[in-house]
Amino acid sequence: MTTQNSTSTYLNVRGRVTQYLPQGSESTFAYFMHKLCYETEASDVYTDMTDGVDNFLVIDARSPESFAREHVPGAINIPHRLMNLETTSFLPKDKMMVVYCDGIGCNASTKGSLKLASLGFAVKEMLGGLEWWKLDGYETEKGPISSNPLVCGCE
């Protein structure tokens, strides 16, 4: 049995998967478009990096120690706890910031994305972080290789 309540949410009382039904193709489209505006995945980041797309930077929001152990190639380390106007002043405002952390169970990328957005940057969070990057079979780098002084100096 399907019913409609006062807030136009459809309720299917016959199962958990279909308990709450989408409210039509327009709202479904808007929902998924909204998600894709703020999230990306490792395979898209890798493909764009490999293809030489240069309209984004990859930001590692973890600690310098975690970054030194391994990170996405070419990533810039700015720990989320240290993100502010001064520590992000070298980042270009005309590029998208793609932020990641360790993966599921780590919310440094969410916190970093929020901070960067509050500072006026266009931001996407890389789903699954470094964990899903590696599960997809992509290589990582070790050590603080960026020429950015923040990589070595943030503690």
What are these regions (language model features)?
Residues 82-87:
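Alpha-helical scaffolding within the catalytic cores
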Residues 76, 93-94, 140-144:
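Short, hinge-like loop/turn segments at secondary-structure boundaries
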Residues 52-58, 73-74, 96, 122:
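Short active-site oxyanion
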Residues 67-73:
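Short loop/helix-cap segments at secondary-structure boundaries that form the rim of catalytic
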Residues 1-58, 62-66, 144-155:
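Flexible, polar/low-complexity N-terminal or interdomain linker segments that lie immediately upstream
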